[in-house]
């Protein structure tokens, strides 16, 4: 995993509440896929968060 993805994920999770994790993120399932899935499920935001290599797509109320 790239360091920039790790830093981005750590910033996103630091102080913000992503309440519901729906899937494992992968090379083909990153923020650009995760966020629209969360929004379609009624959440306000979503992104791949966590520490490499265990990123999860989590949604925010």
UniProtKB/Swiss-Prot annotation:
Keyword Disulfide bond appears in the UniProt entry: yes
Cysteine pairings via disulfide bonds: 21-59, 25-48, 34-57, 38-58
Keywords, sorted A to Z: Antimicrobial, Disulfide bond, Fungicide, Plant defense
Pfam family, one: Defensin
Entry keyword annotation includes Disulfide bond: yes
GO biological process per UniProt: defense response to fungus; killing of cells of another organism
Stated family: Belongs to the DEFL family.
Name the record gives this protein: Putative defensin-like protein 72
UniProt organism field: Arabidopsis thaliana (Mouse-ear cress)
């Amino acid at each position: 995993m790239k360091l920039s993805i790790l830093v981005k994920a750590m910033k996103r999770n630091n102080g913000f509440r992503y309440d519901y994790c729906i899937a494992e993120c992968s090379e083909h399932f990153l923020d650009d896929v995760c966020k629209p899935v969360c929004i379609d499920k009624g959440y306000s935001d979503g992104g791949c968060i966590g520490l490499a290599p265990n990123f999860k797509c989590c949604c925010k109320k």
